[in-house]
Amino acid sequence: MAEPSADPTPTAKPAATLKKGALVRVNRTSYLGSVEASASDPRPPEYIFEGPGELLLVKGEYGQVRWRRPVPDVWLKLSQLEVFS
């Protein structure tokens, strides 16, 4: 029988754990140049970087964000979001 590795590879975790209901904004440097940015308008709206948006749902490495504007909810990688302060 093979023994489990004594030194498991650590998994990458975001610096701040984002949970449902958190107020967030998009980190500009993480977002620009990403796949999500290239699939969207070339000039993203400023309100996503200013915040706050509410994190409605978390699935895997993505979160659904609702902005306090009459716009559709969006799915973004959690690594592109930061806590609004």
UniProtKB/Swiss-Prot annotation:
Catalysed reactions, as listed in the record: a plastoquinone + NADH + (n+1) H(+)(in) = a plastoquinol + NAD(+) + n H(+)(out); a plastoquinone + NADPH + (n+1) H(+)(in) = a plastoquinol + NADP(+) + n H(+)(out)
Coiled-coil annotated residue ranges, if any: none
Class of the enzyme per the UniProt entry, highest EC level: translocase
Instruction: Give the CC-aspect GO terms.
Output: plasma membrane-derived thylakoid membrane
MF terms per GO, please? oxidoreductase activity, acting on NAD(P)H, quinone or similar compound as acceptor; quinone binding
InterPro entries according to UniProt: NdhO
The main location is membrane
Q: Where in the cell is it found?
A: Cellular thylakoid membrane
Which keywords does this Swiss-Prot/TrEMBL entry list? Membrane, NAD, NADP, Plastoquinone, Quinone, Thylakoid, Translocase, Transport
Looking at the keywords, is Cytoplasm present?
Answer: no
Pfam families linked: NdhO (PF11910)
Keyword Thylakoid in the entry? The reply is yes
What does this protein do, in the record's words? NDH-1 shuttles electrons from an unknown electron donor, via FMN and iron-sulfur (Fe-S) centers, to quinones in the respiratory and/or the photosynthetic chain. The immediate electron acceptor for the enzyme in this species is believed to be plastoquinone. Couples the redox reaction to proton translocation, and thus conserves the redox energy in a proton gradient. Cyanobacterial NDH-1 also plays a role in inorganic carbon-concentration.
Instruction: Summarize subunit and interaction data from the UniProt record for this chain.
Output: NDH-1 can be composed of about 15 different subunits; different subcomplexes with different compositions have been identified which probably have different functions.
Return the similarity comment. Belongs to the complex I NdhO subunit family.
List the protein's name: NAD(P)H-quinone oxidoreductase subunit O
